[in-house]
Every structure is written in structure tokens, then in C-alpha cells.
Amino acid sequence: MEQLLLLGLNIHSMKTKRSVSIQFTKTRHIICKAHINGVAAQMLIDTGASSSCIHSELQEHFKLCRKGDTFNAAGASQGKMKAVLTRKSILQLGRHEVGKQAFVLLDLSHVNATLKIQGTLPIEGIIGADFLKKNKVIIDYRNRKLSL
């Protein structure tokens, strides 16, 4: 079977990827529906966030187990913030189980405050570059899909 390579992407394998619907906020942020350990979540897709995060107040809600001690994490707008890693949890995007994912528990109140001002529903977490790179995610803006 002949395969076409374009800009380093294997077009054949792109066709066999799973797709997940995404939505755009009024400010063009990308949102997708997810489940963490079977519990529904609204997640922000953020290519600039190095790690995937969950709002620290939701640790019990998502049945997340801490792993290690609290540390200082650097945020784009909040400077240093207290954070802690979680053990890997079952992550599902759309209707596709994508495997186990560790998260950083972080206070995302400032993110939700900004989203509220912009008329957007709050998020429970952020899907960051760690997940996006590991899973070779492609963001299809025209068709409003993530290809996994």
C-alpha cells in the first residue's frame, strides 16, 4: 500500500486516527468533553501548557490519588503556584478511552474567573502538551475535531 508523506505527516495513519469533537469559546479557546475515572469533565485544550492539570478542588470528585509532595509550579499568569502530581487515571476524550494520564493538581480558579468574565462555562482541567505530544494529537480547526 502506497503512503503519502506531506510535511512529515503520514496521511494514511491520519485517516485511521480516532476523532473527538471540540468546541470553541467566544475567545477561540478550545474545549472538549472528557471523562476522568468515569466522571464527566469539561477540559480546555492548551498547547502552551506543558502539563495536563485538574482543578485542585476536584481531586475527590475525580477520584484522583496524589503522588509525591507539593511543589511550586510556574504558571503563565499567576507566577508560582502550589501543585501536586497525581497517579495515572483513566482518561476518555469524547467516547474514546485514550489510556492512563497523570495530572497536576493546581488551583484553576483564576482560569475559571477569566472564562466567566468572557461568558464561558468553567473548566475542570486542562489537556496540555504532555498528552498532546505523547498521543500525536492533530487539531483540525475547520472540522472542529481532535485526531488522536
What are these regions (language model features)?
Residues M1-L148:
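Pepsin/retropepsin-fold aspartyl endopeptidases
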